[in-house]
Amino acid sequence: MNLGIINAMGNTPTVFIHGSPSYYAKLEGFNPFGSIKDRAAAYVLQKGYEEEVITPKTNIIESSSGNFAIALAAVCQIYRNVFTCVVDKNLLPINKKILECYNAKIVIADKADENGSYLKNRLDIVKDLIDKIDNSYWVNQY
């Protein structure tokens, strides 16, 4: 399997910022899939394969709707794993399109809790999917 693009992660440019104090800033947006989350997604899959808890037949599941979801979808595509992404109705249309481009299966949580948050419902859906889908792996960023 050619993981060349994964090996490119983290090799992002730095720029010098003049000021008091002066400092260098690393431009993580130059990672292949657009954010620092690329590294975490690649690490999860690499480590899972090394420890043999993930195989090519494993369905990767996570509750995320932003940069981590996009990075996981892309990395799963490289490894040829199915990626199921649990999101809520606040998913940005552009992120939905990107996830679809990486063939992510999208499950939408539509019930908010008493505080208006969807996180509990999203996590309940993830747990249900883990129970129902054989050979699945929950990344569990929380």
Model-derived regions: residue spans:
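PLP-dependent amino-acid enzyme catalytic core
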Residues: 1-142
